[in-house]
């Protein structure tokens, strides 16, 4: 439910909150409503070559994994990350993981290459 708040508002879903969120999800693009049915389908399919997760505006999320449990874990991490962003918003602005720190994660965990 929390994740869909980002799909329906167009607010950026920044998963650079904690290392686990970025490692599991990487940076998540958002595609226009109905992209899985129209001329965006090929572009959408291309995204899954380099990332496991995409959002569809006012629609849903698409997530992949090599096993069902892995796919579910990503969805669960995404929803908890979304919930943490929503709950933290009244406390102040997000202090995301930096690009340098992301590069360290990319190298250490062999993701997003």
Task: Name each region found by the language model.
Residues 1-113:
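Glycine-rich flexible loops
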């Amino acid at each position: 439910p929390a994740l869909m708040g980002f799909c329906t508002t167009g607010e950026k879903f920044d998963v650079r909150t904690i290392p686990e969120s970025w490692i599991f999800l990487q940076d998540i693009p958002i595609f226009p409503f109905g992209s899985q049915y129209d001329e965006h389908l090929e572009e959408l399919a291309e995204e899954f070559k380099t990332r496991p997760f995409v959002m569809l505006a006012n629609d849903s999320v698409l997530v992949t994994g090599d096993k069902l449990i892995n796919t579910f874990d990503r969805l669960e991490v995404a929803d908890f990350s979304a919930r943490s962003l929503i709950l933290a918003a009244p406390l102040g602005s997000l202090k995301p993981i930096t690009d340098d720190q992301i590069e360290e994660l990319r190298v250490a965990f062999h993701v997003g290459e």
